[in-house]
Amino acid sequence: MSILFRALNWLMFVDPAWTKERLIPILVFEHPASEPAWNGFLHGDVPSAPLAEIIKPLLLDLIPWIEIFSWERAISEVVSQWLGEMRVFHPDKPSGLSQSEMRAVLRSMRDDTRNSFINWLGFVGQENEHNWLNYVIPLIDECWPRERQYRTSASMRAWIGLLDDSGDSFPVVYEVVKKFLVSVEINDHVFYRFTEEISDEKPITARFPDETLDLINRVTPQVLSHLPYEVLALIEETEPRLTSDARYLRLIDLVERS
């Protein structure tokens, strides 16, 4: 069964009528063979547009269902990326997702799956310099859940990881991401790339000191055990005027009191 459904895209191309009549019903969650069928299918290729259109109602509810089983976590990540591609590349089409559908999918994910999805968005952005503006920013701005319960220390690390991958697009990506950031205790190691030269490019902090200062201030709580000393030092070196900024003064006060 798993081997058969791994070829579902090809079967849909070769004989769509037979595939819709004989195979698609097996994917309904109540079918006794649905578990091995989905397991095989999810180890295959991204569903084609005609197939995605047919099984879309099942895909929308798939993540909570597969998390009932003891499959490897990567399976949930595969589904989340398929759904992300349906929203990013086929928005509001029969084979794609609407804003509300994508938002509901994101809410249905476990925290670790949602954070892996953030990492995937970073990969999408890095594939082409225009992808940040054309695909990544719209999905985050239009679809990401606003509720406080989705802003965890793990999600902060994921968002910061996405930001330090955004290169020249850092200011515009940060502008949309910052609404999902809250002050939580996180290891200062997540900021190491903000002070390091990557591929002979100046560090993010040296290129965008104002946005970096705002980021550090936004995610730093009043009491913490790890402080981003190197980032603050580079901000002072790159843009001395910011040393009189209220955000900088607050962070320096935390440094001096620690």
Positions of predicted regions on the chain:
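Non-catalytic all-alpha helical scaffold/repeat segments
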Residues: 1-258
